[in-house]
């Protein structure tokens, strides 16, 4: 290690120490141990443009070990991103650009929100998938307009999480050679020595999953690190894991190599002793020697800007030779849709009857005909979820151009990979599974919502109507649970036209994910136009079948498959001179964003007798039914029997709805 390298690594370490000390909060051990690998990667290999952090063909970097955020912030500052010393001093403070864990969209240069361990690796896999698909789709002859690498730094905790195995298995199967993961192997976890809980042979595990595994014995050896990354970059047929042996809290005389340095500041005295161990002679905290700034300016900033300029020149020529492809790619990068994107979306007529999963399959195929960068897949349930794009090919290790992704029985990895694909940009992505298994990918949905990613989830088999498979496969609490998640839009459509509307809203999203909750059983098409359905779904709730009188005797509020039931019950109640209005409420979150005036139009304040009908938990419906209303829901688990039998046994029948309304009115 030469003098400038040594000084640069020491600067990264001391900046991280100082930020954590000032905040009196954070994780110094990982940045202190992993600083040399981050330095080597960023100054010798990473192509990034600090002045334009969103440059499309930049290398992607995911700090899967997100608790080491001080390391990333130090790298971003030194590299010339919009992150000042004052920002580093604001580490973990209210309103700062340097939150405790990296947040996408909050800090320039952060490519993914990380912190929940394991998900960063899986998002990096998604980014590598996106790079390969876009490269295969748009690269032509000598024009490699998409050809970057995806890098990640992870720790022991990441590799203990199950999602890392799911994602690594998928990456190896797909031969994602441009994915390189540096493993900060320091033999320490938060609770103590790693051998208390983790003793497997990581090398053999990853080799069994078709990864190349390299080993760096000394994590402080820049030459050794450089050679390993160079070798990894040469392997186009396998992703690479580079195990780098490090010492957590390197340089700390009393805490290096212990769990005590993982998640607590060093303290004033230990910080002083540690800096002395680095031969750091500067008294001032947050000090950066001018020669270190100059070194990073050349190695990262100027190098990256040159690469971006070369890419811009190449893309300008590409536009001349392949104008249509270039226009398409530019549209995809901007996240915009083609002008006629919804022209092939089907319209459903009264009299037809189709499961919403089936109409969803038709709609997504209509969208795929007009949106060339619309891609997705399923966690081994494509036939049931109806997520296959016809005549679009499969994304495989031998053909990355296919638009159908086979995630296998890896729901969590699918969710996180979709996040990575969305973060990468250039694609509109969706993924499907049974609604009950949304719990398997919930942490990835949460990160999608937190990052504001327009991912679409196709959740089918949405209720006890699943039938014979029984309570393990019948969702009950999932609707209420996902509705509680901020910035996730959940839509449960009542028929084909509402399903088409839901998809239209989902693909137009730019700042939130959407969960489509769809039936296995057929649903009758409601007597309204597709335009009326779109207008209603867009507002989250609307009167789908009016009462005869201006003020009804009662309101029936339902979602999904229960809207048809409510309309049937309305007709029966009319025979007994009970006049009710039926409200379809496919999306509570959308309805909550409407004006008070509109809400009162749909749910008149003077109509107190209200019955909500939904084959799921009653939790949350009280807000709309009020103290004088009632909920026909399910607050126990399902059962194994034919679907119609269970539906009737649980009270979702016209006679029971009629009786419940009568009971309300007679209260």
Curated annotation (Swiss-Prot):
GO terms for cellular component: cytosol. Its EC number is 2.2.1.1. GO terms for molecular function: metal ion binding; transketolase activity. Mg(2+) binds at residues 156, 186, 188. Pfam families: Transket_pyr, Transketolase_C_1, Transketolase_N. One of its GO terms (biological process) is pentose-phosphate shunt. The record marks 27, 262 as: Important for catalytic activity. SMART domains: Transket_pyr (SM00861). Its cofactor is Mg(2+); Ca(2+); Mn(2+); Co(2+). Keywords: Calcium, Magnesium, Metal-binding, Thiamine pyrophosphate, Transferase. Thiamine diphosphate binds at residues 67, 115-117, 157, 186, 262, 437. The active site is at 411 (proton donor). It catalyses: D-sedoheptulose 7-phosphate + D-glyceraldehyde 3-phosphate = aldehydo-D-ribose 5-phosphate + D-xylulose 5-phosphate. It is an enzyme of class 2 (transferase). Substrate binds at residues 27, 262, 357, 384, 461, 469, 520. CDD domains: TPP_PYR_DXS_TK_like, TPP_TK. Binds 1 Mg(2+) ion per subunit. Can also utilize other divalent metal cations, such as Ca(2+), Mn(2+) and Co(2+). Binds 1 thiamine pyrophosphate per subunit. Homodimer. Catalyzes the transfer of a two-carbon ketol group from a ketose donor to an aldose acceptor, via a covalent intermediate with the cofactor thiamine pyrophosphate. Belongs to the transketolase family. NCBIfam families: tktlase_bact. This is Transketolase. The lineage of its organism: Bacteria, Bacillati, Bacillota, Bacilli, Bacillales. The gene is tkt.
């Amino acid at each position: 290690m030469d003098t400038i390298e040594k000084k640069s690594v020491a600067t990264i370490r001391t900046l991280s120490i100082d930020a954590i000390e000032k905040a009196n909060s954070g994780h110094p051990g990982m940045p202190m141990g992993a600083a040399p690998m981050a330095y080597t990667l960023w100054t010798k290999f990473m192509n990034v443009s600090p002045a334009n952090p969103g440059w499309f063909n930049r290398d992607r970097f995911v700090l899967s070990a997100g608790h080491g955020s001080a390391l990333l912030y130090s790298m971003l500052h030194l590299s010339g991103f919009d992150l000042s010393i004052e920002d580093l001093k604001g580490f973990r403070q209210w309103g700062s650009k340097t939150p405790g864990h990296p947040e996408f969209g909050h800090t320039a240069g952060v490519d993914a929100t990380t912190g929940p361990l394991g998900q960063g690796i899986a998002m990096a896999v998604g980014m590598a998938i996106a790079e390969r698909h876009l490269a295969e789709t748009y690269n032509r002859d000598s024009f490699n307009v998409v050809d970057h690498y995806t890098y990640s730094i992870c720790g022991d905790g990441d590799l203990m999480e199950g999602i890392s195995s799911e994602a690594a298995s998928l990456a190896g199967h797909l031969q994602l050679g441009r994915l390189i993961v540096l493993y900060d192997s320091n033999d320490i976890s938060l609770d103590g020595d790693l051998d208390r809980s983790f003793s497997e042979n990581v090398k053999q595990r990853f080799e069994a999953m078709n990864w190349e595994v390299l080993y760096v014995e000394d994590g402080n050896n820049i030459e050794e690190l450089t050679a390993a990354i160079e070798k990894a970059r040469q392997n186009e047929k396998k992703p690479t894991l580079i195990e780098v042996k490090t010492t957590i809290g390197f340089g700390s005389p009393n805490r290096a190599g212990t769990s005590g340095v993982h998640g607590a500041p060093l303290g004033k005295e230990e910080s002083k002793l540690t800096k002395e161990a680095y031969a750091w002679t500067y008294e001032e905290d947050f000090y950066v020697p001018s020669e270190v700034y100059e070194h990073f300016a050349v190695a990262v900033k100027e190098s990256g800007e040159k690469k971006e300029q070369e890419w811009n020149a190449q893309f300008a020529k590409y536009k001349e030779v392949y104008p249509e492809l270039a226009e398409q790619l530019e549209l995809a990068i901007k996240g915009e849709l083609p002008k006629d994107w919804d022209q092939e979306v089907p319209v459903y007529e009264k009299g037809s009857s189709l499961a919403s999963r089936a109409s969803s399959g038709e709609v997504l195929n209509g969208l795929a005909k007009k949106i060339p960068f619309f891609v997705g897949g399923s966690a081994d349930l494509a036939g049931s979820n109806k997520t296959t794009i016809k005549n679009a090919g499969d994304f495989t290790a031998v053909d990355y151009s296919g638009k159908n992704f086979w995630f296998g029985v890896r729901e969590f990895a699918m969710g996180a990979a979709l996040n990575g694909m969305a973060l990468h940009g250039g694609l509109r992505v969706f993924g499907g599974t049974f609604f009950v298994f949304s719990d398997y990918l919930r942490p990835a949905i949460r990160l999608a919502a937190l990052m504001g990613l327009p991912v679409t989830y196709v959740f089918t088999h949405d209720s006890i109507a699943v039938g014979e498979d029984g309570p393990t496969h019948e969702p009950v609490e999932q609707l209420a649970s996902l509705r509680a998640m901020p910035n996730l839009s959940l839509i449960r459509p009542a028929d084909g036209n509402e399903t088409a509307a839901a998809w239209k809203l989902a693909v137009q999203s730019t700042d939130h994910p959407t969960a489509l909750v769809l039936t296995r059983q057929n649903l009758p098409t409601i007597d309204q136009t597709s335009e009326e359905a779109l207008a209603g779904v867009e507002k989250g709730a609307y009167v789908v079948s009016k009462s005869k009188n201006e003020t009804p005797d009662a309101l029936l509020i339902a979602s999904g498959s229960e809207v048809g039931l409510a309309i049937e019950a309305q007709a029966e109640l009319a025979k007994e001179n009970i006049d009710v209005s039926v409200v379809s409420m496919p999306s509570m979150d959308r309805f909550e964003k409407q004006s008070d005036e509109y809400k009162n139009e749909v749910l008149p304040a003077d109509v107190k007798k209200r019955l909500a009908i939904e084959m799921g938990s009653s939790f949350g419906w009280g807000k709309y039914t009020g103290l004088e209303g009632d909920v026909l829901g399910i607050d126990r688990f399902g059962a194994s029997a034919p679907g119609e039998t269970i539906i009737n046994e649980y009270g979702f029948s016209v006679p029971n709805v009629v009786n419940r309304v009568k009971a309300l009115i007679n209260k």
